[in-house]
């Protein structure tokens, strides 16, 4: 029973369908989505492009939000934080990992985050220790870490040999030798 008092259960808030959320393309290229009923269409041409989506439509994008291909970058309401939206969509584990591991926030601080700056992920990739970087290469948002690392390498910003070796290790064995040459083009 003492354990229950130590761990405070996070309550999933009821989010109104009309709450507007800003999502950003977190892929190295174009992101397009059209719902099966053709009610929701998103077209973002490059990394960082943003679109407004109401919470009701956001449910259709759940898998993209979970793997961080799309990121909730702003909640246009003072009543709900990014983690509130993520919890309601049941993609909170990825967002909790981002807030705790990438930004180093506590549970309480995470509750107060109303926006996400995509550049913070790039800063983490460039400034983290090798150990921190390797942990994220195996975490919930590894696809995004790998994709952003490749983009930063192409742009000449990521040149840490140890991180590049860790990045290569994520590839199948037969691709590792030529991976960085292939990425550089």
Can you annotate each of these PLM segments?
Residues 98-185:
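Charge/polar-rich, low-complexity and marginally structured segments
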